[in-house]
């Protein structure tokens, strides 16, 4: 698994669904990766020193956007859509387990979608920006 993760031609993805952390809404036990795929990848990269952090971030952002033909996503440059996750590289980790899958990851400070803050200090702002992405 670690060898495959290290291949720069392979991006990271998940078939997990978008569930709420609110157990009154999420009345099922989703797979733990629905809440932790990307933090888990970053944790494994850090712990096993698989690649530089910027390469790991590219495998989560720029490479999938390129593969999907999303030319205005996945990279920070003028004219691109500002979808940004600010995280502590030493603290980021997945916390979900099969026995308790609805758990927030640690180490994520801010999330911006389309330039709008949707997560601040690990807490949702209630912003509902974003939408379905289509190849252009």
Locations of the language-model features?
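C-terminal cap of metal-dependent C-N hydrolases
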Residues: 2-9, 14-15, 85-129
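His/Asp/Glu-enriched, well-ordered alpha-helical/loop segment
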Residues: 3-89
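Long, low-complexity intrinsically disordered regions
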Residues: 128-136
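Glycine-rich loops and low-complexity Gly/Arg-rich segments
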Residues: 36-39, 109-113, 135-136
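Context-gated lysine
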Residues: 33, 59, 103-104, 134-135
């Amino acid at each position: 698994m670690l060898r495959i993760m290290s291949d720069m031609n392979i991006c990271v993805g998940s078939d997990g669904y978008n569930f709420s952390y609110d157990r009154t809404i999420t009345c099922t036990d989703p797979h733990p990766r629905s809440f932790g795929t990307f933090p888990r990848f970053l944790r494994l990269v850090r712990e096993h020193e698989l690649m530089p952090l910027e390469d790991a971030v590219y495998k989560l952002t720029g490479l999938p956007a390129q593969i999907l033909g999303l030319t205005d996503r996945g990279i920070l440059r003028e004219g691109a859509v500002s979808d940004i996750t600010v995280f502590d590289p030493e603290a980021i980790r997945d916390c979900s387990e099969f026995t308790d899958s609805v758990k927030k990851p640690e180490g994520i400070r801010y999330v911006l979608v389309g330039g709008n803050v949707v997560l601040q200090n690990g807490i949702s702002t209630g912003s509902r920006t974003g939408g379905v992405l289509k190849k252009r």
